[in-house]
């Protein structure tokens, strides 16, 4: 099915479709013009090559698929076969799945995007907090850079991540970056870094991405994390605040990532979408 045919079977006018639907239409039209739209068992998808910037691993990124594809086991298998046939040099496929749906083996989660939804009526604590949070200044750039390096190394265990990797430097230099410093008794113990002017390529939605929170002080980690999230939410009020959890391949670290995710989901976060990975 091509995109033009799909448009003509929808009898609603452009004004009657929701903003999200119109944005998806626009995205699919751009993808069609680029030759990236394909179909498997009646489900459309958009796929292109994507090399991991930190490992150079050759992958195929399925940035969009019709909502019914992830729930269709036969379509998932056919998708892998189809992509392998057309991209023989790739090692894996990454599939974007909206919401918290879980895919069957051999798929495994690689990156889960979550959005902050603060609970209404939260009772403030009357105890004096040990942790204070302040906006970072240029004098803090070296500290923030070091914490970001550690965060990327944590995301790629066993991989040599250069301290001056372009991906890290891009975060530091991003004009929309807002960093916050958590401190105890005036001593910095960690940071939270937000990119305030991001946009979802598929939905077109503007959002703020909480790129990293890293706390060196285990004793104050929970309090500092909460305070940094609050600071990021206040600074980006008016647009969704999203973060992510990386799921490493190593089983022990993967289990720990799942514990972190479930802890977040039991608090003020919900799954927006996830990237699931399958090797050939």
Predicted regions, residues:
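Conserved acetyl-CoA pyrophosphate-binding loop and the N-cap/start of the following alpha-helix
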Residues: 74-78, 219-231
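A conserved beta-strand-loop-helix scaffold within acyl/acetyltransferase catalytic domains
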Residues: 49-51, 159-184, 190-206, 213
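Hydrophobic adenine-recognition pocket in adenosine-nucleotide-binding enzymes
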Residues: 136, 213-215
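Short amphipathic alpha-helix that is part of the acyltransferase structural core
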Residues: 1-30, 127-162
């Amino acid at each position: 099915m091509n995109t033009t045919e799909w448009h003509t079977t929808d009898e609603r006018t452009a004004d009657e479709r929701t903003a999200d639907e119109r944005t998806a239409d626009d995205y699919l039209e751009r993808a069609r013009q680029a030759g990236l739209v394909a179909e498997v068992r009646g489900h459309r998808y958009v796929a292109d090559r994507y090399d991991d910037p930190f490992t150079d691993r050759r992958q195929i990124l399925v940035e969009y698929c019709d909502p019914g594809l992830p729930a269709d086991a036969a379509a998932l298998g056919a998708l892998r076969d189809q992509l392998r046939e057309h991209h023989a040099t790739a090692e894996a496929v990454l599939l974007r799945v909206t919401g918290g749906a879980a895919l069957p083996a051999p798929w495994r989660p690689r990156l889960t995007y979550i959005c902050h939804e603060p609970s209404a009526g939260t009772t403030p604590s009357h105890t004096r907090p040990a942790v204070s949070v302040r906006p970072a200044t240029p004098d803090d750039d070296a500290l923030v850079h070091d914490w970001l390096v550690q965060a990327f190394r944590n995301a790629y265990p066993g991989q040599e991540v250069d301290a001056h990797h372009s991906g890290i430097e891009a975060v530091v230099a991003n004009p929309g970056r807002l960093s916050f410093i958590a401190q105890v008794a005036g001593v910095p113990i960690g940071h939270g870094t937000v990119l305030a002017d991001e946009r979802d390529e598929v939905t077109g939605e503007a959002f703020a991405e909480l790129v990293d929170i890293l706390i060196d002080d285990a004793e104050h980690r929970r309090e500092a994390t909460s305070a940094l999230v609050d600071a990021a939410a206040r600074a980006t009020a008016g647009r969704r605040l999203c973060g992510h959890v990386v799921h490493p391949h190593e089983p022990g670290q993967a289990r720990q990532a799942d514990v972190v995710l479930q802890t977040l989901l039991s608090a003020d976060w919900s799954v927006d979408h996830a990237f699931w990975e399958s090797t050939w």
